[in-house]
């Protein structure tokens, strides 16, 4: 029995133990469940609170909107009020204290700003109760926000701050709400416009009283020159490469440096240090003309000494003027160049003449160089600035135009002027000229003289003298022209390598001969330049030549400026080196040792060929220019056939000469049919022949159709697909010139110029082009003149019946300068011609098939 009882007790205890464990587990699970429930409850409370806060915020936003609406109503009441709101305390004594209600609210999206806005109406000021015990809940809430955010309210004005400023000014008496809003909007618009606007130079109008007089004429004719008869002068000019003169009062040419009246130091520098012998043709005629104070247009081949022609008169004029004061930056002389390489070269020439004279300082301002150093040098004062147009515009617009003053500029030079216009610098040059005094002396040098440049010279220069050297052929006679016709790119590259190897073998033979002679014989230095048409071709040819064991100095605009400068210095320093470059250096690069120029890619214009071949045979040296032509480069063959002299063609291989003539004839025939045409560029000897032929054809057509209307004649020319592009050019030539009248009006002491350009009787397509919005906006932007349509169109045979009727259709151009009016008319004619030619081209394409 005891055993049974003991077993039962053990079972009970084990059962109780199991129940206790289950109870403990249940309590543990319950505790976890309670904890989770409590956590969920707290999360629900947070969500509830956030929703309540969101509702509170929405209510607050609604109150803000109501306050805004109330403010707008109050503003309108103030504006409609006949009497202005008094902002000063009333002079009448009142026993009741005036209480001002001030409503403060926040428009900002963040919590870092505070805006307080207060308005007081007339009724509030005069009829305010003595005590206002009622408190607006919104006032209390906003006041608390104001106290909390007071420390963060000292920032920049945002949208809400504008209202705060308005109220403060309103209470102080006297600023209208609209004025504040308008001023703020205008300031914002002005800032945006300033960021987006292009850099434009302000035109400066000088009165005669504020301009300091200066001397232009320094030339005294020597007895030897003055004793020459007119016949002797003609013979001398004929012997000096057939000098052609246009203009009146041109001085006689000189033949010796001593006839110019130069100082002893300058004579020693020219003859002994620089080793200049006799004068070149352009120097013989240009130096006396410029030293006489005349504006000069010099047209001469490259490498003919044009730099000295304007540099000596410039230095002489600068030294004769009053020195710069401490507060004057200068300059007195300005030289504009198309490329930084040419500008640096001119600056080096200036330095040669001024390094011994501390009274004349020169600064070179070009793109790609550090502007900080240029600004520092300009602030110290400088007498001469050599610059590219773009960088000079940048300097003129710095610090609102206060960095540099153009008031003292009396001498302006444009070197390689045709290249300046070819690169599109005409607007910049026009802006620069508007800042310079009108009585300046202006000199323009170029290798070619296209119509666009001629038009600019007429506007800017005063009674200029035009000096043309060797006008019948612009290619330097010291350049021996050759060519090779290839039938593939690989063959052309093989010819290039062969030419370089032949050149190296020739130098080796010459050097071996010199080694057998006296040791005093200098080593031959004959450099070569290879011109290509693009940056990619330049890099490709450079790598291929390097693989062939030929090292070159490669230069193009895609390389960093420092790398270009290092390669150029290496090319100048090393003997018999080879420069590989694009056409960017076809002008202005002066390396006298260059004896060979290889044109790897055929040039597209005659002017480009002139300047490319002009890199060799500098001065009195001789050189060779070899063009590598592909069999399908017909335009290059045409240019070569027109540029090469007869004796050069006779000396060629008969088969090569025959193939060149066939390619040239094929291109010329294609031009007549409209199949081919030369790229746009400056005209040369070959282009003049085309022009004369077109003029002859035009005269014949005019004789045959002299009784037809001009509009019918133009339509027939345009709609004739047989003549192709040649017809287009002829039709553009038949566009009638614009008839206009120029007037001058003086009102209130100010002078206004205006012109009436009559377009009613012009052909319909001309009227369309003249009155297009794009045309008018372009002219306004370029000249600053106002141009508007006036009158109405009258069909042919109809006229205004009386004075009360509107006049015939015309364009009214108004401006403050007569030159701007003339420029506007020229641009209008140019745009009309371009538009008509374009329309004619589209007509040809549409009727081709």
Curated annotation (Swiss-Prot):
Annotated catalysed reactions:
ATP + H2O = ADP + phosphate + H(+)
- Asked if the Swiss-Prot or TrEMBL record annotates the protein with the keyword RNA-binding, the reply is no
User: Helicase C-terminal domain: which residues?
Assistant: 502-661
Task: Show the ranges annotated as biased composition (Polar residues).
Answer: 43-54
The UniProt entry annotates the motif DEAD box at 415-418
Q: Where is the composition biased (Basic residues)?
A: 89-102
Query: Which Enzyme Commission number(s) are on file for it?
Result: 3.6.4.13
Which superkingdom, per the lineage? Eukaryota
A Pfam family assignment: DEAD
- What are the GO cellular component annotations? commitment complex; nucleus
The subcellular localization recorded is:
Nucleus
Main localization is nucleus
Q: Which residues bind ATP?
A: 300-307
Q: Position of motif Q motif?
A: 255-284
Quote the biased-composition stretches of kind Basic and acidic residues, using this chain's numbering: 31-42, 55-85, 120-138, 689-728
- Residue intervals of the Helicase ATP-binding domain: 287-467
Any other comment in the entry?
Present with 358 molecules/cell in log phase SD medium.
The protein's job, in short, is: ATP-dependent RNA helicase involved spliceosome assembly and in nuclear splicing. Catalyzes an ATP-dependent conformational change of U2 snRNP. Bridges U1 and U2 snRNPs and enables stable U2 snRNP association with intron RNA.
Domain notes for this protein: The Q motif is unique to and characteristic of the DEAD box family of RNA helicases and controls ATP binding and hydrolysis.
Q: What is this protein called?
A: Pre-mRNA-processing ATP-dependent RNA helicase PRP5
Q: Which organism is it from?
A: Saccharomyces cerevisiae (strain ATCC 204508 / S288c)
Gene encoding this chain?
PRP5
